[in-house]
């Protein structure tokens, strides 16, 4: 079950799972949603949810570009992930280093910082093979 109780919120979402969340949040009165994703080919799909599409790459774009999008927002939902594409190096780059980039971008926001909601997953079929960056902290 999904529950969202902030009013007059300006939300920001990151990556795949965000399509469903963008639809849910965009349907709420007084809520504006911005969705960040890396592939411009998804712009129409994102816009169809009611969210404002922004194309940025966790792998390639600098932290400051994310900060500029986060300015004035109340909440950042981080749900990005490599999704098993590109092997362990890409998973580390997106899932771990990408999360750090978002944390750093939020820290650079002037004034009130947006809250962060981190959506994460791990392969529970075999918990003994967790990526090192999931358990190393």
Name these PLM-found stretches.
Residues 3-12, 34-36, 82-91, 96-137:
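Conserved Rossmann-fold NAD(P)-dependent oxidoreductase catalytic core, especially the SDR/UDP-sugar
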Residues 35-108:
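NAD(P)H-binding glycine-rich loop region in Rossmannoid oxidoreductase-like domains
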């Amino acid at each position: 079950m999904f529950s969202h109780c902030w009013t007059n919120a300006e939300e920001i979402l990151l990556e795949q799972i965000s399509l469903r969340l963008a639809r849910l949040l965009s349907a709420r009165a007084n809520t504006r949603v911005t969705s960040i994703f890396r592939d411009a080919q998804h712009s129409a799909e994102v816009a169809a949810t009611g969210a404002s599409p922004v194309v940025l790459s966790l792998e390639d774009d600098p932290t400051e570009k994310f900060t500029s999008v986060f300015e004035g927002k109340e909440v950042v939902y981080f749900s990005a992930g490599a999704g098993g594409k590109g092997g362990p190096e890409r998973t580390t780059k997106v899932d771990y280093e990408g999360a750090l980039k978002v944390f750093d971008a939020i820290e650079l926001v002037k004034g009130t910082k947006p809250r962060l909601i981190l959506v994460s997953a791990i392969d529970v079929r075999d918990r003994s093979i967790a990526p090192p960056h999931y358990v190393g902290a």
